[in-house]
Design a protein with these regions (language model features):
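Short terminal alpha-helical segments
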Residues: 1-35, 87, 91-96
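Amphipathic alpha-helical binding modules
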Residues: 63-103
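Short intrinsically disordered terminal tails
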Residues: 1, 46, 102-103
Length: 103
């Protein structure tokens, strides 16, 4: 099975996070939703769950988010469980960024 939809969603989140020096709350929320949808698509299409999600991130900065999301590479990812874990970690970092914009 291909990962076209997941790839498209991850690229959407990457473009929001990587191309902006200071993304606003709405843009970060869009990136979060794209990552969440990619996670759901990957889980449902490939029947993945098994491993528990990573511990929630308490605080994050834009540099960490850019670093994590920049390392996502779906074309070389043959281990879908690792990809799911990485997507969840990126999602949690973006979620922490959205929360920090509320303060």
């Amino acid at each position: 099975m291909s990962l076209e939809k997941v790839d498209r969603l991850v690229e959407q989140a990457k473009s929001i996070i990587l191309e902006s020096s200071n993304p606003d709350r709405t843009s970060l929320w869009r990136a979060y939703v794209a990552l969440e949808y990619a996670i759901l698509d990957l889980k449902l299409r490939h029947g993945l769950e098994g491993n528990p999600p990573p511990k929630p991130v308490k605080s994050a900065d834009l540099v960490t988010a850019k670093s994590m999301i920049g390392r996502l590479n779906l074309s070389s990812s043959s281990d879908k469980k690792k990809l799911l874990y990485d997507l969840r970690l990126c999602r949690d970092i973006v979620k922490a960024l959205v929360a920090s914009k509320l303060r």
